[in-house]
Amino acid sequence: MPYEGQAFQKKIFYEQKKVNKTLKTFGFDHTAPHSLPTQLYYTKGSPDNLFVSGANTKKTYTKFYGWPINKISTTFPCRYKSFNKKNFINILFLPYDFRLGKIITNSLNSFLNKASDKSLNKFIVKIHPVKTTDLKHILLKKELDNIIKHHKKKFTNKSNYKLSIVVGFTSAAIVALEYGLSVLHICPDPIFDKYSNYFWKDIDIKRIDNYSFLYKLKKKGKYLDFKSNDKIKTILKNEGNRS
């Protein structure tokens, strides 16, 4: 099943094994890795084999989250097969929810204050699809749009610098990085939101202020390996032939 380490998923696997001890369970961590994926720690009820979408994710899970190396495999990141790089370029993605809008506005201000004139392409602020009519999100977007207008000297239509801006606890940062973009990550709660080189060694991290960090990827394909084989499809085919 698509596996996120949720309690009910572990319960399903655990109860299935009680009924049939020879049953082999599979989980697919179908998202790009989050900054601190503690919910995926290997424990009672974890699947017999977990599929992840990149070698560095496998390395991190085995080193820090207790996964035996023989119980975790890499596979094609099929969730992102239909994603389009253009949908990440020059966009500031607002999260599903937020508490401290001031941190978001201050961090964007800090980043733009430090940017050189005409170094950036103008970007748009995008409200989460579920929150497009939410007044709190609409007001924050308006405030961010005003900040962008205030820093109009920073923008041009000719910059080759491709940037994506994400906010909070989100795996979208990794997706954008794997598309070859730079990522500004605004982290209202840096301890949980920020990617750390302690876990994720292939990300170059530059601090902008206490709540925002600029990322670049040292080598593509380490977290979302679009060149890998779809092992899940192969396993399902083999299991179907046995039945």
Give short role names for the model-derived ranges:
Residues 1-76, 171-173:
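Active-site and donor-binding regions of nucleotide-sugar-utilizing enzymes
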Residues 8-10, 35-36, 57-61, 82, ...:
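Short, charged/polar "capping" segments at the starts of alpha-helices
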Residues 28-29, 37-39, 61-62, 154-197:
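A donor-sugar binding/catalytic signature common to diverse glycosyltransferases
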Residues 67, 73-141:
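Conserved catalytic-core segment of nucleotide-activated headgroup transferases in glycan assembly
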Residues 136-153:
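Nucleotide-activated donor-binding/catalytic signature segment of Leloir-type glycosyltransferases, i.e.
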